[in-house]
């Protein structure tokens, strides 16, 4: 049992043999029935992460470790990767993140050697980007959905509550973030928050564009 409340709430992960998963899940649910425990849909997992400002590997960003085909075949031989967004699907670097780009410098340990250590140290000393939460313009969101019911140009619709909807495997979604027409970052992990009644996403942006209240544009849709 691990205490890992990534969304800012008290939470635990229970790990064990996959064959026991259903029985253990049911036992926990029955034990918590008198305490108000509730079942939540899988989409809530991602919504909580974005609302809590916690980037999620395999969804908010992709792992460069899987570029190593021998590692990939050994660890996850049947891995399915869904690549989407306005960023060129071939541009996988746009879908990776460094510790500095997601605000995880505090968990980096430099008491041992590892691949990429010099690059990590250099970026931590002089970071260029950081993680922010984007609050989407409600009128723009409504225009996207309304295009499905109006003559003229049709825009790529949002999935609710999570875009893109999570399937088996990893998502590698990346949308361009622009400021006055210039590229300043990458947006991913787009969700509808019922709590805030807003569309939100997590974005890694240039430090100059990271101030609270800064207006940027997300280039929505698939590449090409």
Predicted features, each with a name:
Residues 1-224:
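Conserved, structured C-terminal
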